[in-house]
Swiss-Prot record:
GO cellular component, one term: exodeoxyribonuclease VII complex
Gene3D superfamilies: Exonuclease VII, small subunit (1.10.287.1040)
Assembly information from the UniProt record: Heterooligomer composed of large and small subunits.
A Pfam family it matches: Exonuc_VII_S
Enzyme class: hydrolase
Superkingdom to which the source organism belongs: Bacteria
Enzyme Commission numbers on file: 3.1.11.6
Protein name per the record: Exodeoxyribonuclease 7 small subunit
Localisation: Cytoplasm
Function: Bidirectionally degrades single-stranded DNA into large acid-insoluble oligonucleotides, which are then degraded further into small acid-soluble oligonucleotides.
Transmembrane keyword on record: no
Similarity comment: family membership: Belongs to the XseB family.
Amino acid sequence: MPKKTEQPVSFESSLNELEKIVTRLESGELPLDDALNEFEHGIQLARQGQQKLQQAEQRVQILLSDDPDAPLSPFTPDNDAL
């Protein structure tokens, strides 16, 4: 079966979904296979969130650069980090 192409979601949506996954896992009521699937999805969301935070930090660093004459250029994230 081909892998689903996932649409990019906001950081806040990812965090909300991750919190729901943690709650379901902590309940201890999921069968093992379901728990592993939830855990895998949670890891993916956590990595995506971490990447978005790193990109935001890079943008802030560019904006707060000590060199006032430095040209501002559009930030282009490196999507290979995942």
